[in-house]
Amino acid sequence: MEAKKDSARRLRSIDRTRYAEHEDLSDVEDMVSIRGFSLEQKVSCNAYRGNFVRYMEGKDFTYEYVQREALQTPLLFSTKEGLGIKMPEQDFTVRDVKLLVGSRRVVDVMDVNTQKSIDMSMSQFVRYYETPEMEREKLYNVISLEFSHTKLERVVKRPTVVDAVDWVDNMWPRHLKEQQKESTNVIAEMKYPKVKKYCLMSVKGCYTDFHIDFGGTSVWYHVFRGGKVFWLIPPTGHNLQLYEEWLLSGKQTDIFLGDRSEGCQRIELKQGQTFFIPSGWIHAVYTPADSLVFGGNILHSFNIPMQLRVFEIEDRTRVNAKFRYPFYYEMCWYVLERYVCTLTKRSHLIKEYQRESMITDRKPSLDSHSSDSWLEMEEESCDIHIKEEKGNLVEKPSKQSGDESSTTNSTHSNGKDAAEKKQKATLMQQLKRTLSNDSDESSKSIVHSDFPKTPTGSPATDMPCKLTHLTEFELKGLKALVEKLESLPENKKCVPEGIEDPQALLEDMKTVLKEHADDDNNLAISGVPVVMWPKKPSKNRAVGRPKGKIASSPAVKLSANRTSAGARRRRTRCRKCEACLRTECGECHFCKDMKKFGGPGRMKQSCIMRQCIAPVLPHTAVCLVCGEAGKEDCVEGQEAKFNVMLMECSICNEIIHPGCLKTKESDGVVNDELPNCWECPKCNHAGKTGKVYKQKRGPGFKYASNLPGSLLKEQKVNRDNKELTEIVKKKVEREETPKQIPEEQPKKKPTEGIIKKKPEDGHVRKKRKFEKPPDPSVRKRLKLVKEEKLLRKKRRSWKTPDERAMMAKTLRRIKQEPDDDLTEAAPKAKESDQSRSSSPTAGPSTEGSEPKEKKKIRRKRRVSNKELSKELSKELNQEIQKTESSLASENHHPIKSEPESDNEESKKCISTNGERMHNFSKGLNGTPKELRHELFPSLKTTPRANNRPPPSLSPPKCMQMERHVIRPPPISPPPDSLPLANGAAHVMQREVWMAIFSYLSHRDLCICMRICRTWNRWCCDKRLWTQIDLNRCKSITPLMLSGIIRRQPASLDLSWTNISKKQLSWLINRLPALRDLNLSGCSWIAVSALCSSCCPLLRTLNVQWVEGLKDAQMRDLLSPPTDNRPGQIDNRSKLRNITELRLAGLDITDASLRLMIRHMPLLAKLDLSYCNHVTDQSINLLTAVGTSTRDTLLEMNLSDCNNVTDQCLTFFKRCGNICLIDLRFCKQVSKESCEQFIAEMSVIVQFGQTEEKLLQKVS
């Protein structure tokens, strides 16, 4: 008798745990799961003839229908037309599902015969699904593959009405949904109830017993392929009570619930049909043919009492949290908040949530009208009378914002002033809502333009007087929702963090329900959703080249330090130069600030080595005058291209087409170093100048001071040098010093501003200097060109005819023999020099002083934006290569020349072969100082400047070379045959040799590698070196590391070695296929290399007896890495695939175990031996409800854990898959408790003691 009682009790216990899915499929379970009825008979029986399903067409399924009928009747649609459903093509199969969700995606697969779930990858299930029916040993069914946030999500679209009523879309804060990254339904990574879209894949014969969908959710169900048979039981009080008793009876497999319920209907769904199951309906499903179904679950506002009742049934029947609606009560709180916010315009969300989800307390003031982001609209979409109304309202600025806000939080005011304030606020809110409705394109199809409001009696007193009517279903449901949330104890209220004051929310909801108690149901059925998120303002995306706003007065002058508001644009990368193409150096102060390099991330700057040398205008830039973008690609000819290309002034920052300029008093000076940059004619004519730094590099430019090679200035000097060499061959030797200019000076001396250096000049970058001295002959030739360039530049500064005559005389003397090359070289040098440095007090140049032919020649030399960018990147790359090669070959150290005063800069020097020029000290205007003193001795500013000694050279400094990871090209594959001495190939092919090598030890393989080159490569095949053991190796040398990398092992043992962090980092960066790593006995400093984003996805990790590894270090080891590379957005732990973890001898606590539960969902073998802080509570934590380790744990080693007692064995009973428990040498665990554990588990799983306190499952 006693045995019978125990047996019955145990059977019931077994059945209860069917929700937990932790048991083995033992013989006892198989016996319990045998059905007591014939499923084939139930499919063909005609007894289930209830008439509950309503047949509809998609066009009739509208939001107005939902308001009228409340979604309480099952609906069947023969086609998807009119529903708004989007489905894949007809040839879509489960193999395509695998491709879109990932072949490694783990899914819960239900064994139909035992009603137990097992884990399979999608690849495994698809292989089973495609197996012929006769070859399937078991029936497997996938009913819980949620595919939101996968590629499959874009292929399947829900019915339109479902989107309109779903609480997830309309109640849950939007910014939380946008933060969801994890595609699986791991509760720890879930940001919202992720139950919107499911894929159900069933083979013929699958059966799911009677159930109610979790949380009382309603279900939409589209049969894409195959068919289904449903048994439906209506959710009457009697049926729900019967269903609850049936669940608790333990006889589900013996009783077909449809035979005992009040009414049951069997209905067969065919391919292409869509089914809607309301909340609370009890149903069972049979699959007559292999099927593929798409569906989803929703909670809505029209059947809330039934949803709450189903949730209570789940509480009483103790359904596992894994199979329940996630964040159920949190969702209920957000539902109340959204209704209160919509009806009273008062939000109970915290400020951060209001800002993120774009809900703000819309105060009836002018400021709120202009600042509310979700009320932004285009004025063009508004009617004329609305604009007039807006104008009347805006005439008087609102001064009562503070008063109205206080009125909002207080009781109603009965005074005359308060009434006037309410009236003004009402008008303003009506205007806002009207304008926002006109601009809300997404709501045009279902939202009426005359959107009613809630009355003034609501908690927010500044609302319009029109009433939003609620349906009777919504009123009844919201009332039940308030009562339910009030009745919950404090520890079960589950108030989300986004709700600021839950009690105030409940009070406001009660007030709203009182106000709407007498709502007219006919007026409420309007087809308009009451709660709806405001439309987000669309971000301005540049499609083609959008037009900017045209300035009303383009002739308005701006100061030199002020940018034009409509035309200023930040330049963007050219993406072609060497700087743009390289990676971060990781060593500059910008890199050290970046979060991925461990910094705080405050500077928000790119790496110094990646700062573009030729940034271009963004594609959104437009002309200030005409509002058009650049059109140089549409025309032919250099002159026409220049007139229609955008040019940005380096002084006033105006972006303009040269052809749009009306003033032609003076010509603009083009900056050859920066695309689309010049000094516009307006600034040039007015004599304005900007900072030398801006003129050197143009607006919005940052330069990397330690960039290898220099800018095009150096390249341009090289080209000038080559031209100069050709010129000098045609020239005769002439005097080095020309005649002196007469002593009479002009009244105005503009050269003072030239010679006197500005304070900003200190920011101008100095180029590299080398020890090689300049060639005197080449230097003499350079003086001739600089001499002419200076004179041409100064000609514009002299205003009197005498001054011009003197300058022309000197110029004619220099150019005694005219030459075409020099004629072209001089204007080029002049343009480049003026683009770098212009005279602060230079007067306007006269149009007649320069022939038109020279202007044409100069304009022909201006290239378009794209051509210049290509030229810049090409020449820079060549320069960098030349610089690096010369440094590598000659090993010259740069010598830094530092001027002793502000008047000096480094001069230019060139090498003897004429291939390279570098800067020595020169004058600010680009003229060599010696030549300047010889030409214009009277222009010297002060004796102090004249008597300056030559600059001294500082000691040589080592040049910092670039740090790049050099990836060698892939080596050729190993030969397939062994070449012999006579040139023939050996008869045995490579694969035969590989089979022989597989029998050799590693020591023998190393001997074979010495035979010949071919064997050397064959013996390094990674198939022969899956495991490498360096256990207790005294020293790890670089040669050993290279050998490991060459062999690419899957298992590496580095235990009890002195490997350093740098060595381990170098290894794991180059072993992507590494799966098993043993670092026991190493130091934490070395093990910390695993915290990098480059760590491979290990399966086994052994960190036993690691010195210094505690809870804080475990947190760093298990947390997601912080040094993600650009574009790497995976925020999961790099140890998420760990199945075996050995932590023996570590000083860790329960804090580390919580991290393991969170970040190691596949953990199967855990070694905590010799961990003195592990207690019974630790085991309780590992086996708690909802933890992944409760399902996955197979082996547990707790030997020598002195704080573990007999109580831990009761916790191990929760683990359905546990196979080995090692409690040896645990002082507080008795042998009798182990024997009792074996006896209690014998009904489910047979355990035995192979040694004392070593419990092992008997196979």
Curated annotation (Swiss-Prot):
F-box domain ranges (all copies): 985-1030
Compositional bias segments (type: Basic residues): 536-548, 854-863
Cofactor(s) it depends on: Fe(2+)
Residues that coordinate or bind Zn(2+) 2: 585, 588, 591, 607
Zinc fingers typed CXXC-type, residue spans: 567-613
Sequence positions that bind Zn(2+) 1: 574, 577, 580, 612
Positions of disulphide bridges: none
A Gene Ontology term for the protein's cellular component: chromosome
Catalytic activity, reaction form: N(6),N(6)-dimethyl-L-lysyl(36)-[histone H3] + 2 2-oxoglutarate + 2 O2 = L-lysyl(36)-[histone H3] + 2 formaldehyde + 2 succinate + 2 CO2
Binding site for substrate: 208, 228
Annotated EC: 1.14.11.27
Record: residues binding Fe cation: 211, 213, 283
Regulation: Histone demethylase activity is inhibited by fumarate.
Stretches with biased composition (Basic and acidic residues): 388-402, 414-423, 729-763, 771-790, 864-877, 890-908
Residues annotated as domain JmjC: 147-315
Function: Histone demethylase that demethylates 'Lys-4' and 'Lys-36' of histone H3, thereby playing a central role in histone code. Preferentially demethylates trimethylated H3 'Lys-4' and dimethylated H3 'Lys-36' residue while it has weak or no activity for mono- and tri-methylated H3 'Lys-36'. Preferentially binds the transcribed region of ribosomal RNA and represses the transcription of ribosomal RNA genes which inhibits cell growth and proliferation.
Family per record: Belongs to the JHDM1 histone demethylase family.
Domain characteristics, as noted in the entry: The CXXC zinc finger mediates binding to DNA containing unmethylated cytidine-phosphate-guanosine (CpG) dinucleotides.
Protein name: Lysine-specific demethylase 2B
Organism: Xenopus laevis (African clawed frog)
